[in-house]
Amino acid sequence: LARREREPERIGFADIAGLEDLKRTVRLQIIEPFLKPGLFAKFRKRAGGGVLLYGPPGCGKTMIARAVATECRAEFMTVGISDVLNMYIGESERNLAAIFDKARHARPCVLFFDEIDALAYSRSKAQSEHTRQVVNEFLAQLDGFGTDNQEVLILAATNMPWDVDPAMKRPGRFSRQVFVPPPDEAARAHIVELKLRGVPHEGVDGREIAARTRHFSGADIEGVVELAKDYVLEDHLTREVERPIGQADLLRAAEATEATTLDWLRTARNLVKYAGADDSYKDVEAYLRQHKLV
């Protein structure tokens, strides 16, 4: 079922370059309430509950969740689709109940559900009764139906927040939703440096690569570095020219790569512009306006 994070894999906000606005939001809305429940209790605000991280694929939602657990000094437990869904009637619901029970026994704990849209798909769109039953059980667990979720911070990630059942976003469930945008320029430069660590390279300016990769996800940046490696290896194998990765290789790779976030951003733009989306997506709208995508 839920998998506990091994200590060597734990990272904190100090390990994440850039994204200062996002880190500030996460600290104020998620981490501080968890670390200082007494202060928030004075205002009838309690730690725990659920937070939905959403945004384009490959932009570090899982990394942010891991960092939150580290900053909260809490156990990190991650749950994937295969940990829950089962073909036999009732087994998926039992798996969910067991996962929440395990988290309560590990408190303080951050319980992270990846690809939540697959586990909590909108019941109005679902054609399967099994899907609806899983969502019902998920809602019951979030409500702490007959149990206690205090000191259990529930995080979830999705690339498709519009497919998540609306009931999941009501108060006390995943009522807090945090937009995780594509990495900013500082973060992109850091990713380039990180992916080149231990790899022969020379004269690389990560800042220039970052400037040429607007809207690229972290996964896109990794793809650029991998493509640059291919260029160098091709020279090794076909021309017997041994050399490190250079700036020209990375710029060529960046030019040959398209940002995979653009399709997501177009979908989000249409949702904000034409579908009459509520304030849930105001952060997305602000991002689109800031980057002149609307």
Question: For each of these PLM feature ranges, what is it?
Answer:
Residues 3-27, 37-43, 211-223, 235-294:
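C-terminal engagement/docking regions of AAA+ P-loop ATPases
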Residues 230-231:
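Juxtamembrane/transmembrane-helix interface segments of polytopic membrane transporters
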Residues 6-212, 216:
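Walker A/P-loop NTP-binding motif of AAA+ ATPase domains
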